[in-house]
Amino acid sequence: MRSHSGSAAQVTNGRHTLGSWLASAAVVARASPMDTPPWHPSPIQTRTGIWTGIETHWARAHGRFLVMGVRPLQSVRSEPFQKSWIFLPRIMADKLTRIAIVNHDKCKPKKCRQECKKSCPVVRMGKLCIEVTPQCKIVWISETLCIGCGICIKKCPFGALSIVNLPSNLEKETTHRYCANAFKLHRLPIPRPGEVLGLVGTNGIGKSTALKILAGKQKPNLGKYDDPPDWQEILTYFRGSELQNYFTKILEDDLKAIIKPQYVDQIPKAAKGTVGSILDRKDETKTQAIVCQQLDLTHLRERNVEDLSGGELQRFACAVVCIQKADIFMFDEPSSYLDVKQRLKAAITIRSLINPDRYIIVVEHDLSVLDYLSDFICCLYGVPSAYGVVTMPFSVREGINIFLDGYVPTENLRFRDASLVFKVAETANEEEVKKMCMYKYPGMRKKMGEFELAIVAGEFTDSEIMVMLGENGTGKTTFIRMLAGRLKPDEGGEVPVLNVSYKPQKISPKSTGSVRQLLHEKIRDAYTHPQFVTDVMKPLQIENIIDQEVQTLSGGELQRVALALCLGKPADVYLIDEPSAYLDSEQRLMAARVVKRFILHAKKTAFVVEHDFIMATYLADRVIVFDGVPSKNTVANSPQTLLAGMNKFLSQLEITFRRDPNNYRPRINKLNSIKDVEQKKSGNYFFLDD
């Protein structure tokens, strides 16, 4: 072997020269085609994708170097090739800690040929980097031996593998890991007594894991899943931080924790009986009457739990937690299914629990409610289902803005490419609406038992989104069913005949097959259409879950599938009832963009029922305000502009909103604050000025 001192060997592929790139970073030795180093393994034909036009001939770790044999691809060779040996300093690889994630649902060794193991360069060199046989339930990947070439990811026929590079400084801060090749949580939120801690982050980033650990229901293993540490070692690890005293109190049984579950629609399966009987049984603080009045549950005491709607179940679950004696109160998404008024009442009820000796932790994706509810914020970032990192506590405004901006200034770290900015929809002026008018509906009345709905005549156009604003029980769904011709009005004129596609509020999967089978059965033509794939399937990330069983999907995954099914059906009008339920803040904005883009391209009309104020203002071209007494007498007003409609709706609720100057997100003013009083005096309940 003849080495060239001071310069790197040139391997030209017609487009790039390796030498110029490698000269400062590696020592390269060139050999003739017949020369081989003494440690040369058998040649393998793989492409690493590191350099265009170059393929790796072989690779091996040797001392302080990672040695690779490279040569130009056959298609770009212009002369008899020469092999080159590249010695990359191994420190380049050691700066990043790799974690290998294997998706337990997708990995099927019995149905594949173990392509991951056969194609791995490290395995070809005789090391056990990947272990799998047809009899295995799941593949195992050694994170210490893995060189991060990414070949196994591309070769896996089920897309079950992912290799994620992790900054090495986080390796010492691992709080919990479930098992090999599974999710890792780094750090923990630090709760403070007498204050409300808000947690914000995407789904699958470790918020529920953090809640379980802080509640004492999950013992943190500090990443040592094969040899879990004892509590003394855990307390030593947290020595000097507020969490040391916190866990010490939990171990001494000084702290009792209660968690309000995320999926309230599962409650009827576990709790049987009437609302009143369960509340009587759980009432340890004798505050049941006050809490029921605050959460509007008094009239529901005689109703069975299985007969409650989504919003009623949510309020019932919050009430059950609030009337018990505990030191740690945890609320996982307390605003799902609630309208704006109920969300604020729930927030006030949760804040009424504040006590100098109590810890309160809230996970919430409605940023307006989280802003109103919290005293300080911890953001969680990372790669969903791979790893999550908890930031230090921030003030409420700063914490939410850091999450939306995707940049943590204290760590000088960017965890998202683009910032999330909430801009209000451009409202068409009245003259344009008259010219584009496609459909008119007459004034109507409908009586159903004790409930009566009066509809004021109005009109809507194609390529327009109407957001319906009103409390639960004001007849929004009844209004749509009448427009669709499914309900006949008791009084009023003829309704235009329209085809309607409907996404219900409650999603209960009945399909027993995979997502792919469900889509093929329900929207066969749409889900393979290129325009639909671009506008709907890709942004909603349906491809990631398309081979999973429908029955095993999480709430957020079900919501995305239901939205795709609704938009995939050919219709004149699309009714979408609460598309934001169970979606995180990023997914909510993406779902809003999907609906907006689809309606624009398809030239159809959408009626959206949405209680997340940020999403409602983003979606709305015009709004229909429902007022009156819920479940008794209500009126559906004619469509109004966004500003006029929002002002009317918020004046009924006696709530004022302002906008954040950085990202324009709506923020609820604290009751009787200077801003709140000023806006109420001027009549600007919804403040749009930048």
Which positions does each model-derived feature cover?
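Hydrophobic anchor residue at the start of the ABC signature
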Residues: 317-318, 346, 563, 591
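ABC ATPase nucleotide-binding domains
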Residues: 197-200, 390-457, 462, 635-690
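Helical segment within the ABC ATPase nucleotide-binding domain
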Residues: 343-356, 588-602
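ABC-family P-loop ATPase nucleotide-binding domains
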Residues: 175-180, 186, 221-313, 324, ...
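Conserved H-loop
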Residues: 357-363, 603-609
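ABC ATPase nucleotide-binding domain signature region
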Residues: 169, 192-286, 366-397, 459-531, ...
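Iron-sulfur cluster-binding cysteine motifs and their immediate structural context
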Residues: 37, 113-135, 140, 151-168
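Walker B catalytic motif
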Residues: 304, 331-334, 341, 350, ...
